Swiss-Prot record:
This is Uncharacterized protein UNK4.17. One of its GO terms (cellular component) is nucleus. To S.pombe SpAC12C2.04. The lineage of its organism: Eukaryota, Fungi, Dikarya, Ascomycota, Taphrinomycotina. It is found in: Cytoplasm; Nucleus. GO terms for molecular function: nucleotide binding. Keywords: Cytoplasm, Nucleus. The keyword Nucleus applies. Pfam families: GFO_IDH_MocA (PF01408), ox_reductase_C (PF08635). It comes from Schizosaccharomyces pombe (strain 972 / ATCC 24843). InterPro entries: Gfo/Idh/MocA-like_OxRdtase_N, Gfo/Idh/MocA_Oxidoreductase, NAD(P)-bd_dom_sf, OxRdtase_put_C.
Amino acid sequence: MMQNIKDEAYKTYQNVKDEISSHLPQSAPEPTGPPFKCAIFGCGGINFGTAEGPWNNSQKLELVLGHRLQVVALLSPHKSSHERVLKQKAETEYASSYANTREFYSADEYLEYLDSHPEEKPDAYIIGIPPETHGSTQKGADLELAILKRFPDASLFIEKPISAAPVEDAFAVARRLPSESVISVGYMLRYLKTVQKAKEIIKEKNLKVVSTVAKYNSAYIHNSKKFWWIMSESGGPVVEQGTHFCDLSRYFGGDVEIDSIKVNRVEWDDPSGKLNAMPVDEKTIPPEERIPRFTAASWKYKDGGVGAFTHNITLQGAKYDTCIEVQADGYYLRIVDLYEEPVLYVRSPDSDEEKVYKYPNDDPYYSEFKIFLDAAEGKGDKNLIHSDFLDAVKTYELTKAITEAK
């Protein structure tokens, strides 16, 4: 029975993957210019792709920079991870971008190397490592500050979650960042054309947001990374996964009154919390470390509106179900299917019929990296970056508060 479920889910995944790929840009005109040096921290899925979605930071670097890309350093604690990644890249059209990559096994080792070889300073640092290893002022988790202490004008692309430290410690990092640095945090959904169109409508019509409602229904059967199912390692599904929709909620609604947050959950041991196609053996996880199946949260925004958010771990197969709604006087804006084929529906005072906005082949990951890399190179305005470190810490604060609410 379990194998049949997994087999069917895998077939669904392959179909969805092919469909997604057909809508993403596969190539771009070859960029021209001098070599652009990148150091990549982490050999995991966010930097080099997974079966679960279109995220793949190295691929976006290749698409934006073309053969200008030179990956000068690759960091991971495991030699086998280096070998796997470099072997894969050696078989692609961008093999030359990885031909002279130096391998390092810790941030300290790499930064000490740069101390004695400052001429090898990269043009950008791509940080896609577990949150407990960065985003803090504490030794061993102070990667951003360690880099910027040496190179105050460094350009850092940092994946979410921004930290695993206490929230105040993450805010302390934000306060210590030099103004000349260029920092972008990987909340790519902000770059969707549907999201930007919704923001444009709100601004043009001078609307005050009354409410946001965000829904994230996760497909879990392929999520076999055990750490994801352990609260203390992943931070929980809201911090690790639902963060994108908490972030979009803030993007539309503004800063949150943290003390106003109210939460209800379906826990793993509730009658409706049993999952029949678990990809990991949950018996090996201590009961107090098991994650909730459903989380519902609500809060007040500082501007007076109300936010609501739900995260659900019940879908099988591969396709996620996502939606965010924004309401203001006379206007109802709704964006659906944000990971695959986003569509914006807008009802306005002009008509009860919704106006539909679609943007085929929109790749927010590409847009995100294009803006960041242009800013890093001095060709673009860093104010065009939609998510900086401080803003990402505010999203982290919201997700932590939801996770820790009793």
